């Protein structure tokens, strides 16, 4: 009996160590994909605003960002998306239960003083289709984003009109610089 307990404890410790090692490895790989995605998205946004004003950045979110996310997803066999508790595009940005829980936890962490830029979460989860590695990296609202995501008085009338046309059910406004706009979410089967 003592041997069985010792063997069980040893297996549990070994499994825990392997699990932690896998999560760490997958987290690094996911971060290596998420960070360039965010950097490239910011560059596309900046370019659009410089070329055509704040209203031009809407095209980045409606066309360029989904294409970038789709390309990355196909290249890696993962699902990469942007999600938020205040969704602009319900077809692409609505969080699943895991994402919603973690976005709410991010908000609680901000309330305790943690910096948005450092926030991420990673874990292996059991789902009906099997095990998946899940990763989320919080997105902080930048100063250049308030023209589309700020308070009503910060959003120019032409941008409001375009947003109303493109996103009739838009909830992604009312943010301030530094607040959590949402997160990049990666889901990969393991």
Model-based region annotation:
Residues 14-17:
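N-terminal signal peptide c-region/cleavage motif recognized by signal peptidases
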Residues 146-153:
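Detector for the c-type heme attachment site
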Residues 1-7:
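Bacterial N-terminal signal peptides that target proteins for export
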Residues 10-12:
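Short, linear, compositionally biased motifs with a strong N-terminal bias
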Residues 20-142, 154-190:
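Extracytoplasmic c-type cytochrome modules immediately beyond a signal peptide or single-pass transmembrane anchor
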């Amino acid at each position: 009996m003592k041997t069985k307990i010792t063997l069980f404890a040893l297996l549990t410790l070994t499994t825990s160590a392997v699990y932690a090692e896998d999560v760490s490895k997958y987290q690094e790989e996911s971060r290596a994909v998420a960070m360039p995605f965010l950097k490239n998205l910011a560059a596309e946004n900046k370019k659009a605003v410089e070329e055509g004003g704040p209203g031009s950045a809407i095209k980045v979110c409606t066309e360029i960002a989904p294409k970038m996310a789709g390309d990355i997803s196909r290249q890696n066999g993962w699902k990469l998306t942007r999600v938020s508790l205040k969704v602009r595009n319900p077809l692409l940005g609505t969080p699943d239960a895991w994402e919603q829980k973690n976005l709410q936890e991010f908000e609680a962490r901000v309330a305790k003083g943690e910096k948005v830029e450092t926030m991420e979460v990673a874990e292996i989860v059991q789902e009906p289709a099997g095990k998946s590695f899940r990763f989320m990296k919080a997105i902080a609202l930048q100063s250049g984003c308030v023209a589309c995501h700020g308070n009503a008085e910060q959003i120019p009338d032409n941008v409001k009109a375009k947003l109303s046309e493109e996103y009739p059910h838009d909830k992604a406004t009312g943010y301030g610089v530094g607040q959590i706009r949402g997160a990049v979410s990666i889901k990969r089967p393991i």
